[in-house]
Regions:
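Conserved N-terminal Rossmann-fold NAD(P)-binding element of oxidoreductases
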Residues: 6-10
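N-terminal Rossmann-fold NAD(P) dinucleotide-binding loop
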Residues: 15-16
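NAD(P)-binding Rossmann-fold cofactor-contacting core
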Residues: 27-44
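Short acidic active-site motifs
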Residues: 39, 58-62, 80-84
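Conserved Rossmann-fold cofactor-binding substructure of NAD(P)-dependent oxidoreductases
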Residues: 54-68
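N-terminal Rossmann-like NAD(P) cofactor-binding module of classical short-chain dehydrogenase/reductase
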Residues: 66, 70-75, 95-97
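Rossmann-fold NAD(P)-binding glycine/threonine-rich loop
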Residues: 99-104
Length: 104
């Protein structure tokens, strides 16, 4: 993996745990993205974590946020998951899913 950041889209219960884990990796920077200020404020303060208060449902926002990412983790709520994942794939980024479809 290169030195570009890991971008975590969605910092609720699952995404925040992922951010915390990646922040423990030496020489790894994490960009934590969420629409909720409360979720972002709950993350630990670290020079390895950058928080971004953003709405990934806005046109072009996902492509902008993941442009320099080494890896993108999609941890948005299930109802947003597939559409957000499609945008990550269209951006040509390595990625992983950390959401469950909300249709269940």
């Amino acid at each position: 993996m290169n030195n570009n950041p890991v971008v975590v889209l969605g910092c609720g219960l699952v995404g925040s745990a992922i951010v915390k884990d990646f922040a423990l990796v030496e020489n790894r920077h994490v960009v934590a993205v969420d629409i909720s200020r409360e979720n972002l404020d709950a993350l630990p303060e670290s020079d390895r974590i950058t928080v971004r208060l953003e709405d990934v449902s806005q046109p072009g926002k996902v492509a902008e946020l993941v442009a320099d990412a080494a890896l993108v983790i999609c941890a948005v709520p299930g109802f947003m998951g597939y559409e957000t994942l499609r945008k990550i794939i269209e951006a040509g980024k390595d990625h992983m899913m950390a959401f469950e479809p909300s249709e269940f």
